[in-house]
């Protein structure tokens, strides 16, 4: 058996086409979704990520605004800019590109963004709503992962999901999203002693640890859905995930590649959240 490859780039394109249609309808009602992105400093990786977000906005018709500051900006000045954007009716989503300089407290910045414009889904209020199963902005990468699994048409309810990784951005929230879908969820992390044995029990395995090709065939239950969130660059310059793709291909039922797997879905769900925010601001029902 050879696994079915879940092509995240194709799923993302399909969802962006749907978003584009929604944006056209919103514009007919005088509503233009707007996203503001704040970049502090000149980190090349951050600038690259932002270009992807700007391209996505352009693709679906979202107005985007890039606000740049030097890495010497004070926390007080950055907070003031967020306050301004919170009050700007043209802006439905505010995103501060992380990481920030060490003298700025990321927690304070994230919590200053209005929960109504927190399209990254990082604000504690939105995290709390997600935990309790309420309608809210879901964190983009976990939401993208859930959508990719749904593309397999597998009934998530009752399945055993194992998440390797416990970051606040991916690991913790993705487990909660699967729990909200009535899955049984097990978390594994650096202190878990029997990761291999636990992961082999997974109907759905999500790996997000940042260790190249850590997960091999002996971690995988036959026919499992394997979602690889890791993006690692080898000495050869080639990108690879946390899963040894070729090694796992013959035992998994479904698997995401790296690249063109989870990555394209992250930006797509950011666009989705921005459009949803515009609908809420304009009181447009789904």
UniProtKB/Swiss-Prot annotation:
- Domain of life of the organism encoding this protein: Bacteria
* Pathway the protein contributes to: One-carbon metabolism; tetrahydrofolate interconversion
Reaction catalyzed = (6R)-5,10-methylene-5,6,7,8-tetrahydrofolate + NADP(+) = (6R)-5,10-methenyltetrahydrofolate + NADPH; (6R)-5,10-methenyltetrahydrofolate + H2O = (6R)-10-formyltetrahydrofolate + H(+)
Does the keyword Membrane belong to this entry? Answer: no
Keywords attached to this Swiss-Prot or TrEMBL record, sorted alphabetically, are: Amino-acid biosynthesis, Histidine biosynthesis, Hydrolase, Methionine biosynthesis, Multifunctional enzyme, NADP, One-carbon metabolism, Oxidoreductase, Purine biosynthesis
One GO term describing the cellular component: cytosol
Q: Which organism is it from?
A: Bacillus cytotoxicus (strain DSM 22905 / CIP 110041 / 391-98 / NVH 391-98)
Q: What is this protein called?
A: Bifunctional protein FolD
What family is this protein classified in?
Belongs to the tetrahydrofolate dehydrogenase/cyclohydrolase family.
Q: Which InterPro entries match?
A: Aminoacid_DH-like_N_sf, NAD(P)-bd_dom_sf, THF_DH/CycHdrlase, THF_DH/CycHdrlase_cat_dom, THF_DH/CycHdrlase_CS, THF_DH/CycHdrlase_NAD-bd_dom
The reply to whether RNA-binding figures as a keyword in the UniProt entry is no
Q: Please give a single GO biological process term from the UniProt record.
A: L-histidine biosynthetic process
A single Pfam family it belongs to is THF_DHG_CYH_C
**Which residues of this UniProt protein bind NADP(+)?**
165-167, 190, 231
Assembly state and interactors? Homodimer.
EC number of this enzyme: 1.5.1.5, 3.5.4.9
Q: What does it do? A: Catalyzes the oxidation of 5,10-methylenetetrahydrofolate to 5,10-methenyltetrahydrofolate and then the hydrolysis of 5,10-methenyltetrahydrofolate to 10-formyltetrahydrofolate.
Q: In Gene Ontology terms, what is one molecular function of this protein?
A: methylenetetrahydrofolate dehydrogenase (NADP+) activity
């Amino acid at each position: 058996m050879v696994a079915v490859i879940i092509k995240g780039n194709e799923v993302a394109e399909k969802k962006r086409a749907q978003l584009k249609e929604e944006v056209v309808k919103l514009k007919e009602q005088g509503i233009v979704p707007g996203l503001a992105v704040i970049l502090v400093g000149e980190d090349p990786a951050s600038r690259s990520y932002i270009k992807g977000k700007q391209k996505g906005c352009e693709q679906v018709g979202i107005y985007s605004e890039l606000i740049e500051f030097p890495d010497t900006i004070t926390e007080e000045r950055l907070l003031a800019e967020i306050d301004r954007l919170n009050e700007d009716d043209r802006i439905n989503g505010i995103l501060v590109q992380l990481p920030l300089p060490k003298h700025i407290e990321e927690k304070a910045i994230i919590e200053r963004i209005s929960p109504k414009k927190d399209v990254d889904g990082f604000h504690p209020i939105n995290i709390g709503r997600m935990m309790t199963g309420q309608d809210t902005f879901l964190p983009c990468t976990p939401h993208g992962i859930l959508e990719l699994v749904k593309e397999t048409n597998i009934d998530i309810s009752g399945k055993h999901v194992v998440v390797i990784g416990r970051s606040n951005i991916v690991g913790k929230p993705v487990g909660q999203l699967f729990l909200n879908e009535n899955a049984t969820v097990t978390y594994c992390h650096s202190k878990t002693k029997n990761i291999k044995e636990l992961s082999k029990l997974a109907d759905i395995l999500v790996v997000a640890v940042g260790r190249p090709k850590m997960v091999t065939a002996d971690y995988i239950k036959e026919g499992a859905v394997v979602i690889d969130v890791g993006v690692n660059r080898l000495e050869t310059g080639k990108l690879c995930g946390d899963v040894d793709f070729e090694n796992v291909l013959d035992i998994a039922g479904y698997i995401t590649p790296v690249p063109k797997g989870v990555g394209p879905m992250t930006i797509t769900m950011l666009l989705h959240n921005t459009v949803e925010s515009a609908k809420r601001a304009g009181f447009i029902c789904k």
